[in-house]
Amino acid sequence: MIYPKTYDVIVVGGGHAGTEAALAAARMGAQTLLLTHNIETLGQMSCNPSIGGIGKGHLVRELDALGGAMALATDKSGIQFRRLNASKGAAVRATRAQADRILYKAAIREMLENQENLDLFQQAVEDVTLDGERISGVITAMGVEFKARAVVLTAGTFLSGKIHIGLENYEGGRAGDPAAKSLGGRLRELKLPQGRLKTGTPPRIDGRTIDFSQLTEQPGDTPVPVMSVRGNAEMHPRQVSCWITHTNTQTHDIIRSGFDRSPMFTGKIEGVGPRYCPSIEDKINRFADKDSHQIFLEPEGLTTYEYYPNGISTSLPFDIQIALVRSMKGLENAHILRPGYAIEYDYFDPRNLKASLETKTIEGLFFAGQINGTTGYEEAAAQGLLAGANAVQYVRGQDPLLLRREQAYLGVLVDDLITKGVNEPYRMFTSRAEYRLQLREDNADMRLTEDGYKIGLVGEAQWRMFNEKREAVEREIQRLKTTWYTPQKLAEDEQIRVFGQKLSREANLHDLLRRPNLDYAALMTLEGAMPSENLSAEVIEQVEIQVKYQGYIDRQNEEIDSRRDIETLKLPDGIDYGKVKGLSAEVQQKLNQHKPETVGQASRISGVTPAAVALLMVHLKRGFKDAK
């Protein structure tokens, strides 16, 4: 049957990408349908029970700045919060939280069920329908056809998923869930370029069988950090500790003894695994000189004894899993509740996507999450929000939301995917960004909230909070610039106490705060330095960073401005690179293969040299007919 309602946007998949995509589209006022094979698993944390970290936490803050759900759900479910790299530069500071799986899933479902313009329906999708080269809807397992003007596909690891434990394997999207075999086959029929990737998960351990007296405790931070600008510490559930143990030479010998039955080493697994989150057998093989690896025991929630041993993801046979777990200190009597496993799945070459995450070959079809070759909840969620928003913009005939590399880590992520592609699961790091001093956790709202508000992603309450913060920062910076001190105004001992030396000339608070050995709190101990208004910790942090890093930020802005023409100059559809004088055959081939949308994207394709970019610029600026 054909369902009687036609939707603006259909989202397929209820994981982190799918839920953010559906919420984004519905927030923008589009009639949206979220299809999932099981409503009970909406927003499920399939692997580790944590959100954030270096690079990933930056993405979560960017999601939040655009009205996304992940940060707020984490505040409602987080059972341990830590600020990583707190003693380092502002660019690499990041927030990480352990989340209660049940509370996180409940928070996401509550948001979905209370979101206007959003319908939920429980059915696996087996086919997509086309009107020529344009998407027109989807067909579910029981034959219901849903019509839509745009479709966002967020299938995660479910497309032709295969689970491996030792030499045994079976079809599945994750443990306990079926694979999307029919949909995977249908997408292959559409000639979308695809490949296979792999990820994995560790065995879960019953906390009642862990000897915590032999482990090192890792408590959370005090005061407890907050993830969302809409959240607060009062939202947080009870806070608990993580624990640390280590592998040893016995553990490594046990792991090596299972190599002959490992699907990774016997060729059973075709997909490439994540370089920066390798399985324990891969670690032991690649780093044979290391006698020990640190393992974090992370609680899965407040109402369960289950622990997640972060660092021993494995697809080794179950007897090896038992032995390797029990070889570690504190786990000698550990009972495994669920075995570890590897899963390989289809992904589609993201170089076939536009910067909006719409496919280049099928109009109105958007991809987000692991289907694009990424790994991680945060990477998936960020893509989901962008794809959902751009699906609405497509339906409305409006320009897509495109984020630049110097504007957001999400901009870096998408640009990397569509220009370089992937040959292993892509994970976000701060080192991937050229302008990471601009892309801090603390200023995600300053970078993105206004853009989100303009297209309807950000609600009025969040917009009001943002403006109050932005105005408070501007007022305080201006006050610092107009509050002056002279050597004569301050007692000599007061100067030495605050500045570490005597003032040599008149200075304002703004210039004094730029000194590397002086922070805002110390400066405010000067007589007459305190502001009349009560400033939040977030405003003070923003003021201090903006003042101290102003010189570096100004230099980066000059560099960004110098590249602006290259980054934004559009390459015409159907441009004939053979008519660009001086381009080598290799560069022509790469440009024809990748079909970049801008000169900036072209410049980041492997093999496209600066000289080739210069030739492109000359060609476009001359205004040849084929480039108009």
From Swiss-Prot:
One of its GO terms (molecular function) is flavin adenine dinucleotide binding. SUPFAM superfamilies: FAD/NAD(P)-binding domain. One of its GO terms (cellular component) is cytosol. The keyword Ribosomal protein does not apply. GO terms for biological process: tRNA methylation; tRNA wobble uridine modification. Its cofactor is FAD. Keywords: Cytoplasm, FAD, Flavoprotein, NAD, tRNA processing. NAD(+) binds at residues 273-287. It holds the Pfam family SAM_GIDA_C. Its main location: cytoplasm. The keyword NAD applies. FAD binds at residues 13-18. SMART domains: GIDA_assoc_3. Disulfide bonds: none annotated. Transmembrane segments: none annotated. PANTHER family: GLUCOSE INHIBITED DIVISION PROTEIN A, PROTEIN MTO1 HOMOLOG, MITOCHONDRIAL. NCBIfam families: mnmG_gidA. Homodimer. Heterotetramer of two MnmE and two MnmG subunits. HAMAP family: MnmG_GidA. NAD-binding protein involved in the addition of a carboxymethylaminomethyl (cmnm) group at the wobble position (U34) of certain tRNAs, forming tRNA-cmnm(5)s(2)U34. Belongs to the MnmG family. This is tRNA uridine 5-carboxymethylaminomethyl modification enzyme MnmG. It comes from Neisseria meningitidis serogroup A / serotype 4A (strain DSM 15465 / Z2491). The lineage of its organism: Bacteria, Pseudomonadati, Pseudomonadota, Betaproteobacteria, Neisseriales.
